[in-house]
Amino acid sequence: MAHSKEIPSFRWTQSLRRGLSQVHPTVKTDVLKDAKLIADSIDFNQVSQVQRALRKNKRGEEDLNKLRDLNKEVDRLMSMKSIQKNTIFKIGDLGRDELMELASDLEKLKNKIKRTESGPQGLYMGNLSQLQLTKRSEILKTLGFQQQRGAGNGVVRIWDVSDPSKLNNQFGSMPALTIACMTVQGGETMNSVVQALTSLGLLYTVKYPNLNDLDKLTLEHECLQIVTKDESSINISGYNFSLSAAVKAGASILDGGNMLETIRVTPDNFSSLIKSTLQVKRKEGMFIDEKPGNRNPYENLLYKLCLSGDGWPYIGSRSQILGRSWDNTSVDLTKKPQVGPRQPEKNGQNLRLANLTEMQEAVIKEAVKKLDPTNTLWLDIEGPPTDPVELALYQPANKHYIHCFRKPHDEKGFKNGSRHSHGILMQDIEDAMPGVLSYVIGLLPQDMVITTQGSDDIRKLLDIHGRKDLKLVDVKLTSDQARLYDQQIWEKFGHLCKHHNGVVVNKKKREKDSPFKLSSGEPHCALLDCIMYQSVMDGKMVDEEPVALLPLSLLFLPKAAFAL
């Protein structure tokens, strides 16, 4: 596709929605919870002051401080936010060609955005003092030039501040904030605002809503009168009632629709998101258009994904993030030696992040080396293979085990699994160290034979991580056989794992011939299940307590210490 060709913007948006459909959770409840808290807690006199400051053509340090202070308060109140997370993609996370493509597109995007922010037709709008701006106007007038004031109906907004980096990530709308401001400042009920924005969101599933659409919907929903009809401009804040902010809010509170706005990035799905995005890009012929101007759908998605590897790219608070996308996401094409193959697969989840240090990697490598590839090695997981929450490796011959956890990205599915299977509570694993589970799988000795009880999910998990070389032996015990020593194992070795504190509700038969019924109300722990299966194979309880190869301090992020 020639880059001068008109971009089929909405078609690209629809294609990206479909290509990333696996990561569109329903977030309406979370958005409205944050909106209610903001509406009840924020000082709307401060909001009015910030809105007034942002309407000025020339803004200074005091205006920026007001904006940053209010953003900090909103960020404190919100549960939906993006956090600082610097990500380095390496070979194994993505293929070499994908890494090069990502690096190239981020560089092009950087150039485009910097040119756009420097002003139309080369007019610099950045960190000039008021004296310099006045002097420049006089020089241009003397030389016979008309001073440019922006393209079309757009308004040039000049910030006269000492540190331009403080402007980063202070702008952009958030649905929770938009809903709260429309409710309080519009004198409306939140329910009427939600209904109106839902109508906009439904329209957005088939087209980009425009001002004519807004006028027609306003006849049905009077609260939409507060939405401004002004042209969008650079550095528009989340406190402005723009049409784009209203549409984004509407998209976020739809149930279904595969809206990009509801994407959540986690350390474990980041690489697969990038991989899927690049696949859609190639299929549709998308590209980075380096000419200054608004971002096309691919540019917008790439920028938002790469700003932080942990959070809500479109709808969360991001005002506490430092740097830009090209600062926070980088590519390293240096191939590091590995014990086992870690080839990129379709779902590409072998993400390496800054919070798994070289020292931590060395500890994990040393632990995996202690597993004997010639002896029986049990492997069990809890959670689905695409979103596992627990993994255990147990070797009876040397009494060694590796046991690690992972925070899930599908919280609804996790709660269901907790209730009917593993009994893990989110509060017990929310601080699990990202990347450990994938790194352990990647280091397993090549062509090793692994013993399992049920192999389908484990086979899929290994394939996702590029470990098709690993062989599985499924002992295929019945449910009753597998859990013969259930209670005895929990009584003897339950102290080895303290992360199954939920109540497990047995699945009951609906009919007489129902083939499935759990025979125990004990939770399923990957580690204790491995010990249990070995006991069944031995025909007696395992006697000796196994030894952990990974320290607990490596498995979880350190808790923040608070001093009064």
From Swiss-Prot:
Residues reported to bind Zn(2+): 390, 497, 500, 525
Superkingdom of the source species: Viruses
Binding site for the cap structure m7GTP: annotated segments: 54-236
GO cellular component, one term: helical viral capsid
An individual GO BP term: symbiont-mediated suppression of host cytoplasmic pattern recognition receptor signaling pathway via inhibition of IKBKE activity
EC number of this enzyme: 3.1.13.-
Pfam family name, one: Arena_ncap_C
Chief location bin: virion
Sequence positions that bind Mn(2+): 380, 382, 529
Enzyme class (EC, first level): hydrolase
Subcellular location per the Swiss-Prot or TrEMBL entry: Virion; Host cytoplasm
Molecular function in Gene Ontology: hydrolase activity; metal ion binding; RNA binding
Coiled coil start-end: none
Positions bearing the site annotation: Important for exonuclease activity: 457
Keywords, ordered alphabetically: Capsid protein, Helical capsid protein, Host cytoplasm, Host-virus interaction, Hydrolase, Inhibition of host IKBKE by virus, Inhibition of host innate immune response by virus, Inhibition of host RLR pathway by virus, Interferon antiviral system evasion, Manganese, Metal-binding, Ribonucleoprotein, RNA-binding, Viral immunoevasion, Viral nucleoprotein, Virion, Zinc
UniProt-listed Gene3D superfamilies: Arenaviral nucleoprotein, C-terminal domain, Arenavirus nucleocapsid protein, head domain
InterPro entries (alphabetical): Nucleocapsid_arenaviridae (IPR000229), Nucleocapsid_C_arenaviridae (IPR035084), Nucleocapsid_C_sf (IPR038115), Nucleocapsid_N_arenaviridae (IPR035083), RNaseH-like_sf (IPR012337)
Description of its domains: The N-terminal region is important for the cap-binding activity while the C-terminal region contains the 3'-5' exoribonuclease activity. A CCHE zinc binding site is present in the C-terminal region and may thus contribute to the substrate binding and/or the specificity of the exonuclease activity.
Subunit structure: Homomultimerizes to form the nucleocapsid. Binds to viral genomic RNA. Interacts with glycoprotein G2. Interacts with protein Z; this interaction probably directs the encapsidated genome to budding sites. Interacts with protein L; this interaction does not interfere with Z-L interaction. Interacts with host IKBKE (via Protein kinase domain); the interaction inhibits IKBKE kinase activity.
Family, per entry: Belongs to the arenaviridae nucleocapsid protein family.
Function: Encapsidates the genome, protecting it from nucleases. The encapsidated genomic RNA is termed the nucleocapsid (NC). Serves as template for viral transcription and replication. The increased presence of protein N in host cell does not seem to trigger the switch from transcription to replication as observed in other negative strain RNA viruses.
Protein name: Nucleoprotein
Species for this entry: Machupo virus (MACV)
